[in-house]
UniProtKB/Swiss-Prot annotation:
Gene (name only): gtdc1
Keyword terms of this UniProt record: Cytoplasm, Glycosyltransferase, Nucleus, Transferase
Lineage: Eukaryota, Metazoa, Chordata, Craniata, Vertebrata
Subcellular location: Cytoplasm; Nucleus
GO terms for MF: tRNA-queuosine(34) beta-mannosyltransferase activity
Name this protein carries in UniProt: tRNA-queuosine alpha-mannosyltransferase
């Protein structure tokens, strides 16, 4: 039996999600990993570690790895692995990583990724933005070499490149959804193949490809409000919160969130410089200065160096904070997302955005920069052009949180699901017969 060799030098976050999903869904996998710590050292030295860790086998046919690993080093150190079909997956690229000063950019990381592309058989990117920003930056990036620069590398690498969106295994969130996020069944196209139901109330929820305007939603809600009032008391929504409390109050976690409750903003990103937490918290502090009421959940993983703004903001925002810190339990994390109204990104470095799409799946209204990958993923209504525009949108939502709670996402998340992408991934990972094996 042929074996799919999975190698992940930074086994955490979306890197871990992808490897775990492939291992679970594709037969004949063997996985080698390094913990998601000290990213810079993983990028520098992982190949040497895997040279010794990966056991030799005649069954290997495909090697799948992320661009954290220097694939060129690994196949040079292990010629037996060089004979495999080598697939390199880019979650991010280092050629356009944001640094505060040009002198801070470490040339080696981007250079390693270019070398890895040259030895790979197939190079896969999680978005068109990721692919184009990488390929079109190669020439400029290599100008940092003082002389004798290599030529035409974009032309050499491009033919082996393709886009294959990150596959999200969207979970069943019905037990966590508050009532206002459950959609009356008469508003949903029943032909949609991606609709789930709250069993006790015949209310449909989940990822929808159907689009409704705010006006359509409001009219339908007004027409059915009397009937809903009759059923609300006698039939408890099956999407109410569970007993385990992760926020400050049981009332906040309960499924029956009334429209007058303060806007709940969630920030579910890594606590690092490239996610630009400074801009996010500056906007929230301005909301505070305007004496606007809101609740806040700051989630996401933390690593060795946490920006100072987090400790400062925690104190300043005080009673507005409902949850602060990483949630190791996926169920707790999904529960927190389901209780939020708006999910915000202020990223300066984003090539897909799993956290944003997961939050949208949980019924959050997304607000994203009009740059990076976001225009590729989200309709224009969810994009902002400046911190000032983000502030204005959040200010409006704080004054009228009911507008957000009535809104239904106007985009489509299903195309990013494992169900939609499974076939492409299986085809990608199929071994190609080789005479030299």
């Amino acid at each position: 039996m042929s074996t799919l060799l999975l190698v992940e030098a930074f086994y955490g976050g979306s890197h871990k999600q992808l490897m775990d999903l492939i291992k679970e869904e594709v037969e004949g996998c063997i996985l080698y990993t390094l913990p998601a710590k000290k990213w810079h050292w993983r990028a520098r030295t992982a190949a040497l570690y895997f040279m010794q860790a990966i056991l030799p086998s005649d069954t290997y046919r495909v090697l799948f790895t992320s661009s954290v690993l220097n694939l060129a080093e690994l196949v040079a150190l292990r010629p037996d692995l060089g004979k495999l079909k080598k697939i390199l997956y880019f979650h991010e690229n280092q050629l356009i990583y944001p640094v505060q000063k040009s002198q801070e950019r470490d040339f080696q990381y981007g250079y390693n990724q270019i070398l890895s592309c040259l030895v790979a058989d197939t190079v896969v990117f999680n978005s068109a933005f990721n692919m184009e920003s990488f390929l079109t930056s190669i020439k400029t990036f290599l100008k940092k070499i003082p002389d004798h620069r290599p030529k035409n590398l974009e032309e050499i690498i491009r033919p082996k490149c393709r886009v294959l969106y990150f596959p999200i295994n969207f979970p069943d969130i019905r037990q966590y959804l508050p009532e206002h996020k459950c959609i009356p069944h008469n508003l949903v196209d029943k032909s949609s193949s991606d609709i789930s139901y709250c069993p006790k109330t015949s209310i449909q929820t989940g990822r929808m490809s159907v689009e409704f305007s705010d006006h359509q939603i409001q009219c339908s809600i007004d027409e059915s409000s009397a009937e809903q009032e009759k059923t609300t008391v006698s039939e408890k929504n099956n999407c109410e919160g569970v007993d385990h409390v992760i926020l400050h109050s049981q009332s906040t976690l309960a499924g029956d969130i009334h429209q007058e409750k303060p806007l709940h903003i969630v920030w579910p990103h890594r606590w690092e410089h490239d996610k630009d937490p400074e801009t996010f918290f500056k906007v929230l502090l301005k909301l505070k200065e305007k004496e606007l009421t809101f609740h806040l959940s700051v989630l996401g993983e933390t690593f060795t160096d946490v920006p100072d703004i987090f400790s400062e903001a925690r104190i300043t925002l005080g009673s507005s904070v409902l949850h602060w810190g990483y949630l190791a339990s996926k169920d707790d994390y999904l529960q927190a997302l389901c209780m939020a109204d708006v999910v915000v990104s202020t990223a300066k470095h984003e090539f897909f955005g799993v956290a944003m799409l997961e939050a949208v799946h949980c019924g959050c209204y997304p607000l994203c920069p009009k740059s990076l990958v976001y225009p590729e993923i989200f309709p224009a209504v969810y994009l902002y052009s400046s911190p000032e525009q983000l502030l204005r949108k959040l200010e409006d939502f704080c004054k009228r949180p009911d507008i957000v709670r009535r809104h239904r996402f106007q985009g489509e998340t299903e195309r990013f699901s494992w169900a939609a992408l499974r076939g492409e991934f299986r085809s990608l990972l199929d071994a190609e017969p080789r005479e030299d094996l």
